[in-house]
Amino acid sequence: MTVIGNHEVVGMEGAPRLSEASARDYFELLKPRVMSLVVFTAFAGLVLAPGHINPFIGFTAILCIAIGAGASGALNMWYDADIDAVMSRTAKRPIPAGKILPQEALAFGLTLSAFSVIILGLAVHWLAAGLLAFTIFFYVAIYTMWLKRSTPQNIVIGGAAGAFPPMIGWACVTGGVSVESIVLFLIIFLWTPAHFWALALFKMGDYGAVGVPMMPNVCGEATTKRQIVIYAVLTAVSGVCPTLLGFASLGYGAFATVMGLGFVWYSLGVLRMPEGDKRMVPAKKLFAFSIAYLFAIFSALLVDYAIARIWLGGIV
């Protein structure tokens, strides 16, 4: 497969300059939907970490992590502008739509990256800042520039970038990394392949058109479906680990088990999906459920933590 070259969108005729692009256009560069998940899981890591952090410092930490995530999104859109212009799912993004020039997106992303890392280091903790810097580098250089266009395992390895936020939030409070923060990392890391391969199944045409070697395009639907089930099972097991390791209650464990079984159930629906199915309804259902699953798991961890704090505080 031939991957489209980045040069095909540079120097767009009639594209607006910095002063003509709206604030909304630049906000779209930050990938706000992805950022919301990053912010939520980082917040969970910060709250669940043992110790105390000043509320203002905590707010600053989450803001810096959000800006860093947005910077990664902007740099990803800068590099992927060529394939975004071809794929129906991404054709309306600011750069291929002609609202922002590629070089402006690059400058915007680099500026936000430096700002988020430096402020997080100065105001909160340099280990957390280092993890944020590594996350930005990993997502942009390792995943976007290398893995995404070179291997069907791009999501498996590249998924690490999306799994770091709770670990960064944890480090903001404790100044370190622990088994608990690694478990939070693993939940997202193992969740990522099933989530994105479900999307890749019903967007095979888009990925095939631009030569991105996603699992369904390179290895076929059958292999992808089996891999989805494997990662769904691994995700379900990792979701229960907080209880197994003693930092979440049996109530959380029961909830995580039910959600995990739901994840596996939807993945089995994908496995049973006929080869060449054009509608891909089971894949779309799994994709939607996977998003709900991750938000539900981290929400349950926060609720479980709040209940434990109330109980230990003698309020009930």
Curated annotation (Swiss-Prot):
InterPro entries listed in its UniProt record: Protohaem_IX_farnesylTrfase, UbiA_prenyltransferase, UbiA_prenylTrfase_CS, UbiA_sf
In terms of superkingdom, the source organism counts as Bacteria
Q: Which UniProt keywords apply?
A: Cell inner membrane, Cell membrane, Heme biosynthesis, Membrane, Transferase, Transmembrane, Transmembrane helix
Database matches in CDD domains: PT_UbiA_Cox10
Task: Quote the function comment for this protein.
Answer: Converts heme B (protoheme IX) to heme O by substitution of the vinyl group on carbon 2 of heme B porphyrin ring with a hydroxyethyl farnesyl side group.
The family classification in the record reads: Belongs to the UbiA prenyltransferase family. Protoheme IX farnesyltransferase subfamily.
Q: What is the name of this protein?
A: Protoheme IX farnesyltransferase
The scientific name of the source species is: Rhizobium meliloti (strain 1021)
